[in-house]
């Protein structure tokens, strides 16, 4: 199946998404911040990235912009947040995000995306 990178500063979210995606047969790598996400992206190719918008070191929209301007936004990215506004979601899709998931994320929401 797919090789997926989950980027979220909340351990519970990373664990939940990893469990759901592994149960569906996907290979999952986890990153707790933008620094780890950059390293994971540099080390491997992903079929999909699930990227949290609000993280302590660099927010997900800034990381998305960084990947787009560097020409490494070669995979679909689904942005995630429990606090984002519609404007933030629209900005992310303009930059290149494929979709947006509002937290809390359920199995049905995730598999629909």
What are these regions (language model features)?
Residues 8, 52, 81:
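Active-site residues of response regulator receiver
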Residues 11-29:
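Two-component/phosphorelay signaling modules centered on CheY-like receiver
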Residues 25-32, 36, 40:
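Short hydrophobic/Thr-rich beta-strand motif most characteristic of the beta2 strand and flanking loop
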Residues 39, 61-73, 91:
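Short amphipathic alpha-helix used as the core "switch/output" element in two-component signaling
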């Amino acid at each position: 199946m797919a090789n997926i990178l989950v980027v979220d500063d909340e351990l519970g979210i990373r664990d939940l998404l990893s469990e759901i995606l592994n149960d569906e047969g996907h290979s999952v790598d986890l990153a707790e911040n933008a620094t780890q996400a950059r390293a994971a992206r540099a080390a491997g190719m992903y079929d999909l990235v699930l990227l949290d918008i609000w993280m302590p070191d660099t927010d997900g929209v800034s990381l998305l912009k960084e990947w787009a301007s560097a020409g490494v936004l070669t995979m679909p990215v689904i942005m995630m947040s429990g606090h984002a506004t519609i404007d933030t979601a629209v900005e992310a899709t303009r930059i290149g995000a494929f979709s947006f998931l509002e937290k809390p994320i359920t199995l049905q929401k995730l598999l629909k995306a």
